[in-house]
Amino acid sequence: MQLQQIIYNFGTNFTLKKGMLGIRYERVDPEYKTLGAYYFNNDFENITLNAAFNLLKDKLSLQTNIGRQRDNLQNQKGKQTSRWVGTVNANFQASDKLMITASYSNFTMFTNNQLNQFNNINNNPLQIQQPRDSIQYRQISQNVNININYALSATKEKAQNININYSLNDMVNKEDGIVRRGGISRFHNANINYNISFPERKMNIAASINYTNTYAASQYTNIIGPSISFNKGILKDKMQISSGASYNISSGRGIRTSVFNFRAGASYAPWEKHNFDLNIINMFRLTNQNIPHPKMNEITCTVGYNYRF
């Protein structure tokens, strides 16, 4: 006798004085068929919890979400997968000038290839190094981001702000609790940006320094360098001119490379539907790598015309 395959999907939210709590449950039985979105997606169960709160006189807002998904609900498959997903977001308005945001997310996946029980019974217990036909696989991915923005000044004549940002991406792959060679990858990025604008002059200047550290395939790579840019509107804002320069040094695996870029461009719109563009990029590269051209100077020039119908 074949049991009827059904689907469940329900949830509720509880409103609090300074926040909210919610829960949702979703289940789709194996071999459930419909003409809707679940035709190709069945045999899974989702449980999700979420919450949001406003604290410190509404200066701090917190949002969090955690959920679990699993398949193989009736143990009919040779493999079972479960996933955990969690996120936390925070926004803190410390003052009229200072804003801090932070976020964290975690994705964890477990996969178990189930053993054939008859193989376990029939295996000779004296053969200690019996080949395994089951692997417990786990993948953990974590992301962190922190952003700090501070407004130095804000007037009609001049506006200044400084921004600091840091991000991390970390991924680990495990087999039977063991991290194999190359099973870890980690990415760090940090940058500081300074921006000053003169609204009445239609002019903006920005400067930044960026640092990146990457660990992948058991190797480290570092990249660091500053950049600066300039933008201004002229001819009653019909023309926009811009220029910029950047320099970075990368090192890793015994290779060191330095790159310098200079950019200049202009955009001119003499009439409402017509636009002309001119951009020039000059790149200098120097490396100690054993390649045919360790020193390179490249110039790229593009000219464009655009008509809007």
Label the predicted regions.
Residues M1-F309:
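Exposed, low-structure sequence patches enriched in small/polar residues
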